[in-house]
């Protein structure tokens, strides 16, 4: 009889822990958004989760949500919908995408600066519920980013959800379910996600499968190389958008105006070309 009571108590404790909300959960949800992606005809393709990592609207999500998309929107915690402006980087192998949303003044999550050790508590915060587990094993990516294996498998609805430590700091994103375990990708892997003139094979594959505007590379020299390659592959309207953003970002660079003037000449917009040449 005592044995049955003991087992019942253990089960009740397990259920209580699974359903318990960490103290920081309500605050964290203010930085979590819902994502909708759309096809070329404006039809809804997929829905997922994203979370903001800076005040200017930079966010991270599961790449699979964006694969094949021509447009995306995010709905913040207040229920307001915002367009995704640019893709800032993506990786096919590790299924992570970084993007900029047309939203200002968001409260970003604080990213954990240190790796979590085996046995550390991990809290996965979904749209409505939270699951807690602990770190069962770890492996390294590129020698500096951690790939965590958890002590349990979460529901597929948590794919792409943010994962926190006991301090409420952002550790990673739910990446995959394999066997009886869920795996979490280190948030800091987002540091590798950027737009480059010559991207890696994994980044190139991911970016080619997202039919949305990408941000410019982070420095002028590489951005000029990026412009050159895009002049060979982008449509006139796409290329004009890229050149316009380049001249806005680097207004002192004469090369940007020259390239735009060349495009205007090709489009027979001679007055606009003349403005850029003078």
Annotated model-derived regions:
Residues 1-23:
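Bacterial Sec-dependent N-terminal signal peptides
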Residues 21-26, 106-159, 174-185, 196, ...:
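Flexible, gly/ser-rich surface segments that form the specificity/activation loops bordering the active-site cleft
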Residues 54-123, 128-132, 144-147:
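Conserved active-site neighborhood of the chymotrypsin/trypsin-like protease fold
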Residues 22, 173-238:
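C-terminal cap/linker of serine protease catalytic domains
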